[in-house]
């Protein structure tokens, strides 16, 4: 399998120096600080998550760099915690409406499990609604229970990750597209909206 470098290269400061979210997180010569949700972990009681949105509003006022959320489709108590419980994209859209400056980041979006069209539609929508503040931390996934649940072979996650990143990058391009990928194909169609600044920073995280 050959994947074009231009479609899979990650974020770098020169490429995203004018991106509102990325430039807040990776400011040259500055140490930046953000928060990683949740601050209190779910253990059967949703009330532990109360008040987090108000906290995010406050860190936005206090000039923090970023708020991070996680992509945890299934809670497996034998493996680890449930993250912030809420769907990461729905929750970031909610937080985008309550903030003005803080970068909105995922750590990590599981590209090997989610279809790139759905990923792009959600990501580009949040980027537009937030004024270009979205940064995607991306990963291939590590929770064994999730792969058979999605009908994906865990041993193939690296290849699916690369395929999804390539597909996702192509969807940022303007105009009608012709895409032929192992994950799907279409002719003369376009995914809308597009990211505010033409692309979304992708950062491999774990």
Per-region residue spans from a language model:
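N-terminal beta1-alpha1-beta2 module of alpha/beta enzyme domains
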Residues: 2-98, 194-202
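Internal, glycine-rich beta/alpha segment that forms the wall or movable "lid"
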Residues: 4-29, 79, 112-206
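A short, mixed-charge helix-start or loop-turn motif at secondary-structure junctions
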Residues: 37-38, 77-78, 105-108, 150-151
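Active-site beta-loop-alpha junctions enriched in small/polar residues
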Residues: 38-42, 72, 109-111, 139-143
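Alpha-helical structural elements of signaling/regulatory helical domains
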Residues: 47, 101, 153-156
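Active-site-proximal glycine-rich helix-loop-beta segment
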Residues: 63, 100, 130-132
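Hydrophobic residues within beta-strands of alpha/beta enzymes
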Residues: 67, 104, 134-136
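Alpha-helix-loop-beta-strand connector modules within alpha/beta enzyme cores
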Residues: 82-105, 160-167, 171
């Amino acid at each position: 399998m050959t994947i074009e470098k231009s479609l899979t290269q990650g974020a770098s400061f020169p490429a995203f120096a004018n991106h509102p979210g990325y430039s807040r997180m990776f400011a040259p010569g500055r140490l930046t600080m953000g928060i990683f949700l949740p601050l209190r972990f779910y253990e059967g009681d949703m009330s532990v998550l109360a008040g987090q949105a108000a906290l995010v509003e406050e860190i936005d006022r206090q000039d923090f760099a970023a708020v991070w959320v996680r992509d945890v489709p299934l809670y497996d108590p034998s493996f680890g915690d449930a993250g912030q419980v809420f769907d990461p994209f729905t929750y970031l859209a909610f937080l985008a409406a309550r903030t003005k400056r803080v970068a909105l980041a995922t750590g990590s979006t599981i590209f090997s499990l989610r279809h790139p069209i759905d990923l792009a539609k959600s990501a580009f929508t949040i980027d537009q609604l937030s004024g270009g503040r979205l940064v995607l931390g991306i990963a291939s996934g590590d929770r064994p229970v999730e792969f058979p649940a999605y009908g994906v072979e865990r041993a193939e996650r690296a290849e699916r990750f690369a395929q999804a990143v390539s597909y996702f990058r192509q969807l940022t391009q303007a105009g009608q597209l012709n895409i032929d990928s192992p994950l799907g194909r279409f002719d003369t169609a376009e995914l809308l909206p597009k990211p505010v600044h033409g692309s979304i920073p992708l950062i491999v995280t774990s």
